């Protein structure tokens, strides 16, 4: 499979910071995959997301080493405008993504297209398509600042998708939503991934990570502490040392193993857990 993200020995320290936020981070992401980044607060996840879309080094200034490549482009020598054709970021707080110059949701969705010479007709067509995808057709004439948090999150995701990126980076973009709103946004993201978009997602919901991820990377104190399939990462006892709350059915499987039940592998999905427990109790 083609590697669309390649991070090699990347370190970064913000200007005037007293410590290095990212330390010799290396990993790659395959085209069309669902790649999840997990870790405790302060482990460097958001900084890494900023590096993947070019906000580091072009917006956040500091000292760096190593390289970050998106497709064939070196982030350090590419402009953010050029990178936005390939990779888009959705922030944890959707209000941080608003332009604050757009008077309507339609203008907010179209804001990024203005840097790429898109015709008015094409712009209207793209806005209509993204609004339908995000189920916000009825909000196009509304002021973004008057919307609910869940509605603004849809607008933020839509304003990223309108650029038609091949790679979507999500920095805990459902953290401020209620459970229903969170699942609605996640369902959209999952469908986009099934259609071929590469997804890099920071998330604290380990059951959701176990359910959807092709690869899971654990961050701790600015370093990569584990990298593998959900089965590999959640079955490793070392994972919990980095503030990861592993899924309950993994804990249950481990408890059954400790109690003497013959479970060759730990379950990382609920259906696996039910099947294994039934077999163990026969």
Where are these regions (language model features)?
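Conserved ABC ATPase "signature" region
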Residues: 110, 121-139
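Conserved ABC ATPase signature
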Residues: 143-147, 151
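A short, proline-enriched helix->beta-strand linker immediately N-terminal to the Walker B motif
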Residues: 162-166
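Catalytic Walker B motif of ABC-type/P-loop ATPase nucleotide-binding domains
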Residues: 168-171
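H-loop/switch region of ABC-family ATPase nucleotide-binding domains
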Residues: 203-204
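Conserved ABC ATPase "signature" C-loop
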Residues: 221-222
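ABC ATPase nucleotide-binding domains
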Residues: 239-282
């Amino acid at each position: 499979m083609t590697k669309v993200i390649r991070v090699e020995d990347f370190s970064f320290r913000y200007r005037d910071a007293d410590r290095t936020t990212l330390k010799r981070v290396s990993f790659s992401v395959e085209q069309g995959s669902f790649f999840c980044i997990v870790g405790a607060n302060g482990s460097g996840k958001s900084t890494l997301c900023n590096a993947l879309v070019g906000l580091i080094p072009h917006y956040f200034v500091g000292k760096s080493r190593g390289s970050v490549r998106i497709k064939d482009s070196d982030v350090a020598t590419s402009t953010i405008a050029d990178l936005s054709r390939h990779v888009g970021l959705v922030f944890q707080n959707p209000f941080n993504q608003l332009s604050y110059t757009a008077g309507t949701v339609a203008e907010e969705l179209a804001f990024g297209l203005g840097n790429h010479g898109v015709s008015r007709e094409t712009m209207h067509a793209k806005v209509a398509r993204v609004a339908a995808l995000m189920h916000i057709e009825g909000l196009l004439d509304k002021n973004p600042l008057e919307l609910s948090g869940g509605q603004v999150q849809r607008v933020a995701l839509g304003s990223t998708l309108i650029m038609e990126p091949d790679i979507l980076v999500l920095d805990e973009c459902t953290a401020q939503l209620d459970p229903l709103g969170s699942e609605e946004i996640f369902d959209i993201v999952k469908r986009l991934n099934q259609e071929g978009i590469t997804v890099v997602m920071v998330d604290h919901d380990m059951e959701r990570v176990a359910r959807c991820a092709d690869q899971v990377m654990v961050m701790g104190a600015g370093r990569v502490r584990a990298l593998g399939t959900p089965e590999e990462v959640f079955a490793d006892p070392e994972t919990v040392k980095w503030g990861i709350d592993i899924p309950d059915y993994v804990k249950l499987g481990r408890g059954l193993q400790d109690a003497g039940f013959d479970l060759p592998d730990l379950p990382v999905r609920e259906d696996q857990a039910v099947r294994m427990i039934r077999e163990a109790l026969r």
